[in-house]
């Protein structure tokens, strides 16, 4: 096994391996400093070229490469391609937060975030996360890509109870299974419900008495919103109004965190317009509920979320193409699920610590936009399929896209 990562994470994994695993680690590549020599008797290779030379000359008995750090500034594409060339398995080392047993490391399939053109931006500040400690928290859309990750993140900060709402029975089943696996089901209660069912929502809120609501439930896809405009308006606008009416009614509600989108700025699609309207409705409520806090969090496209281009491209590549791109000139700002969730949680806590204004809007700097066709080409090049074999089809922009 070869480890790739920063010094701290590599050392942490080596210590874990000594006590609880039996991997034979034969070398390290550290990407954050110029440390040479060895760590706990394991050789540090200077760079990828030195590793390539050793592999080429059969001087290493290696079958896998483990990436120990999830927030590296380096593009790891070369390591991935090198691993493929020498038939090595390559995995992310994932730290598992677990209430059942000792914390554990899992080997996960390689993630697209390792190949972004910018480092992952995780915003963590423990002094703000104390905001969630011992609180009752309500999360709408709790089984979706964003909502389910928010549930898992908040569990790290010892809430009193998390209450989750989702319209999908399958989503509720999946999030229940995931939380049970890590041993925190006693901290969570999940309900299948529609946020437009005002009577049921009011009964649940009266029963649960949450102090914080994170409103993530939404129809989020541009094309689906265009084809189902009544559902998009009902969910994104009237569903938000329903949650705000409950927020106004109950005194135990103190903080309303609204998950929005950068498409709400100068909206050109129905989905963007529904979020624009919902944001302004939040602002109207903030003006009359001066003793309560409102937070609006905007972010762009979320990589690897349900229905995003990454899982679509993966499936198309797995089926040997073609990979479909709407327009060769289209670009998008991207962020990762864990980036989006860290922004949401920090923004809510930051706004509470500010007494100057009871409503604020936060937006993460997502770096430079990424051309969708370049992302497709990169994913094809990193796949196990001959890149000359997979075709890219240009399909044209869908209604509402730009």
Language-model regions, residue ranges each:
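Conserved Rossmann-fold NAD(P)-dependent oxidoreductase catalytic core, especially the SDR/UDP-sugar
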Residues: 86, 101-102, 215, 219-279, ...
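Conserved beta-loop-beta element that borders a ligand/cofactor-binding pocket
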Residues: 252-255, 281-332, 353-361, 390-395
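Mid/C-terminal beta-alpha module of Rossmann-like enzyme folds, strongest
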Residues: 350-402
């Amino acid at each position: 096994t070869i480890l790739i990562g920063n010094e701290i994470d590599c050392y942490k994994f080596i210590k874990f391996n000594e006590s609880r695993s039996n991997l034979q680690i034969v070398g390290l590549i550290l990407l954050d400093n110029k440390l040479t020599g060895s760590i706990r008797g394991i050789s540090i290779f200077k760079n990828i070229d030195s590793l390539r030379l050793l592999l080429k000359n059969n001087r290493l008995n290696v079958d896998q490469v483990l990436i120990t750090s999830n927030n590296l500034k380096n593009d790891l594409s070369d390591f991935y391609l090198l691993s493929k060339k020498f038939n090595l398995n390559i995995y992310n080392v994932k730290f598992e937060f677990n209430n059942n047993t000792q914390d554990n490391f899992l080997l996960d399939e390689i993630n697209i975030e390792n190949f972004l053109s910018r480092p992952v931006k995780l915003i963590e500040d423990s002094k703000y996360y104390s905001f969630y400690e011992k609180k009752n928290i309500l999360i709408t859309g709790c089984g979706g890509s964003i909502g389910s990750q928010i549930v898992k993140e908040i569990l790290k900060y010892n809430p009193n109870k998390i209450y989750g709402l989702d319209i999908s029975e399958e989503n509720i089943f999946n999030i229940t299974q995931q939380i049970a696996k890590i041993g925190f089901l006693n901290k969570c209660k999940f309900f299948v419900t529609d946020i437009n069912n005002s009577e049921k929502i009011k009964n649940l809120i009266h029963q649960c008495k949450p102090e914080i609501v994170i409103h993530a439930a939404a129809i989020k896809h541009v094309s689906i919103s265009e084809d189902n405009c009544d559902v998009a308006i009902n969910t994104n606008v009237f569903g938000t109004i329903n949650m705000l009416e409950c927020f106004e009614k109950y005194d135990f509600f103190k903080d309303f965190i609204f998950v929005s989108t950068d498409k709400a700025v100068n909206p050109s699609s129905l989905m963007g317009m529904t979020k624009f309207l919902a944001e302004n409705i939040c602002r109207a409520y903030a003006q009359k509920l001066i003793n309560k806090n409102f937070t609006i969090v905007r972010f762009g496209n979320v990589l690897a979320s349900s229905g995003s281009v990454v899982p679509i491209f993966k499936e198309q590549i797995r089926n040997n193409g073609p990979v479909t791109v709407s327009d060769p000139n289209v670009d998008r700002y991207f962020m990762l699920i864990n980036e989006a969730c860290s922004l949401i949680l920090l923004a809510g806590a930051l706004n509470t610590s500010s007494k100057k204004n009871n409503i604020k809007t936060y937006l993460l700097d997502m770096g430079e936009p990424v051309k969708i066709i370049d992302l497709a080409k990169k994913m094809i090049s990193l796949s196990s399929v001959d890149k000359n074999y997979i075709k890219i089809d240009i399909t044209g922009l869908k209604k509402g896209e730009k």
